[in-house]
Amino acid sequence: MATLQKILVVEDEPDIQAIVKLALELTGGYTVEVCATGYEAIERALMFAPDLILLDVMMPGLDGPATLHALRKIPQCSDTPIIFLTARVQPHDLERYRALGVRDVIAKPFNPMSLAQTLQTMWSTYDRATDA
C-alpha cells in the first residue's frame, strides 16, 4: 500500500469539518478535501482519488452507510479504506459497521490533534495486512 497522503473528509457539521481539516494538514501534512454530503463525497472521490476516507455516519440525505455503498461502486474507491466517524459506538453498531465493510471506527468526540497519529497508526496496520 502506498503512503497515506490524500484524505477525503465527509462531515455535515462545518465546525467539525474545519477542525479535522486543519488538524490533519498541520499535524499530519496531509492533503485534505472536505465535503458535507454523501452526494458530494461521490463527486469528490471521482476527482480527488483519496487514499483514505473519513465518513460521518449520520448525515442528512445520503447517510454514511449509503454513501459507503455508493463509493464502493467507484473503481478507484473499491479498496479505499473507509473509517466511520460516529457517536454511535455500541457493540451492535460496530458489528453493523464491520458488516458494511468499514475498515475502522473513530468515536466522536475525538481529539483532533491526535487524529493524524491515530490515522497513521491505522494506516500502518492496513499496510501490514496488505503485505501479509
What kind of region is each of these model predictions?
Residues 14-33:
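Two-component/phosphorelay signaling modules centered on CheY-like receiver
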Residues 103:
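Short, glycine/charged-rich "phosphate-handling" switch motifs in NTP-dependent
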Residues 110-119:
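C-terminal output helix
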